[in-house]
Amino acid sequence: MSQHAFLSPSASHRWLNCPPSAKLCASEKDHASSYALEGTDAHTLCAHLVERALGRDSPNPVESLTYYNSQMQECGDGYASFVMEELQKLQMNDPDAKVLIEQKVDYSHWVPDGTGTADCILLSKDTLEIIDYKYGQGVLVHADSAQFGGNPQLMCYSLGAIARFDDTYHFQTVRMVIYQPRLKN
């Protein structure tokens, strides 16, 4: 499993609520559960499926996925279709809209050493859309939050994308989307 940033987007709900927790968690050994490993496989498949839907070369990772099954394929196909639908909506106003998959973002202007990898970023002349794929089925994840006004993980990704691309695209709208197919979200 890859090393996470000290103040990672995926743990932002925790370190925003309890800043000392970041230091405590950093001292713990990072071990991945079978659920996390399954999620990693699902993300690998999704990235491949979106790349293929975009007409890009992408080696099929299925043989190397430990947790691959028909449900993972079905969920990944749905995700790829969803991303393409969102892209088509943006292309109605901007034919040059782009999709970035597994894009590194840097939000360190706001959070020390703040970096992460966004599952999917859609860019158009005035709209930024962040799509986060959640394969888990234990916890329903929302794109909004009464406490923070938005999902903290997606907000970190959005800040990083704005920092990198706003000079080119001049965003007026930022959309944050959770795609969680096994919980119909």
Annotate the PLM regions.
Residues 37, 95-185:
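Mg2+/Mn2+-dependent nuclease catalytic core
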Residues 1-127, 175:
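Metal-dependent nuclease catalytic cores that hydrolyze phosphodiester bonds in DNA/RNA
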